[in-house]
Amino acid sequence: MLLTLAASLLIVNAVVIDGTGAPRRSAAVRVRGDRITEVGALAPAPGEAVVDAKGLVLAPGFIDTHSHGDRGLFEHGDALAAVSQGITTIVVGQDGGSPPLADFFARLDREPAAINVASYAGHGRLRGKVMGEDFRRHARPDEVARMRELLAQEMKAGALGLSSGLEYDPGIFSARSEVLDLAKVAAASGGRYISHVRSEDRYFWDAIDEIITIGREAKLPVQVSHVKLAMHSLWGQADRLLRMLDEARAAGVDITADIYPYLYWQSTLTVLFPERDFQNRATAEFVLREISTADDLLLGRFAPEPSYAGKTLAEIARLRGTDPPATLMALIQEALAFEAAHKDDDDVESVIGTSMSEPDLERLLAWPYANICTDGELDGRHPRGFGTYPRVLGRYVRERKVVSLEEAVRKMTGLAAHNVGLRDRGAIRPGAFADVVLFDPATVIDRATTRDPQARAAGIQRVWVNGAVVYEAGAPSGRRPGRALRRETTR
């Protein structure tokens, strides 16, 4: 039976982990409508629905602070990739890309999804709207002024703040001063700044300095998106990075990070060439030596030749009879030509690359100010789209003991809500919204892989959003209780 919380529900015999980091405790949780009303030793009221948790963990619903679920959200309204791993809220508008938010939120009001959705306003979209195709340069003062006006409108529409993707077009061509000016607009509205920083490899330390500087000078909270050391010669330097972040925090900069529990990322082939020198063989050789080997670059999508999806660069090179650097350069040229001929297709190619080390990942994941995110989409081309949260709970809590269960839940809920500025979510307490997940800590684990990226996780028993069941017994309920979470109210 699919249970809803339309009137009153009591969840009994639960091990409650409340999202604050406090020790687990046995308790019952009462929900009326969309809110948690009581937590403690509670007896069922007459006529009240009762769920027996049977000693499983009841936690706040997980909050994905870096999601690309806005792509295909209205086509995948059940948000199966999210709810099947316990996610109840996603934060979109990432990496500098966002839809016009007034229209987006209005549509969510009319056509709600199974999950809650908040959004940043994307720097790349603002830049593209003002500069059009002439973006391969620094913006003029009048252009920055126009971007500021547009951002102010997006903040009024409910954006959490400003996002940037400074390894991507068009943001990669921006001056630091441009981003700082826009961050000040977000700050003036009580917003924040989240960034896929300007480099996760060659120019990494300068990129971290940039986001710290923006936080200090714009006087707003800043978050490093999907923090990683994505170059072989950077491996082993997680402690150096954490010292920089801790020193910035000690100096008054509210800097945080989010992270996903995989050694491989998903992005585009072009991002591997920060100078956009796509025909420079020396750059291609550097990529395959320092960033990811040909055996570790896996195409997720390649519109010019769809059969390449699921093949590594090494495999494609053998098929074509060319060496990996030449193959990499040729694939980019073919993708650019396809993109030029198909202006409406903004998803021409994607690649999954293995670039991180396990010790660095574990050090960064354990940092007290790093919350968990997926960086995933609802169609799950990278296994993080379906597996992130169960992977943390199974691999990094139960098996490797990198963090405690209480700390992991805090990173998925209370800390995540704090780091993006959401109120009354990410907690099990009276007055909080009834976004909750029931899971088995002994069996929860991810099943998604690069070959089967949409395999559902094990151990997630039941998920509620705003008091309604959205996932139970391995299946979505069909309900759409999610809400648009605008910054003014974030509810």
What would you call each of these model-derived segments?
Residues 102-109, 113, 124-140, 147, ...:
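Polyanionic/metal-chelating signatures
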Residues 280-281, 362-369, 375, 388, ...:
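C-terminal cap of metal-dependent C-N hydrolases
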Residues 14, 29, 34, 55, ...:
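Divalent metal-coordination and catalytic microenvironments
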Residues 16-61:
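Histidine-rich, glycine-flanked metal-binding segment
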Residues 61-72, 193-199:
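Histidine-centered catalytic micro-motifs
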Residues 153-210:
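Divalent metal-binding pocket/active-site signature
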Residues 53-58, 62-67, 75-164, 183, ...:
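Divalent-metal coordination cores built from histidine and acidic residues
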Residues 16-28, 340-341, 345-356, 361, ...:
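Acidic, glycine-enriched loop/beta-strand segments at the rims
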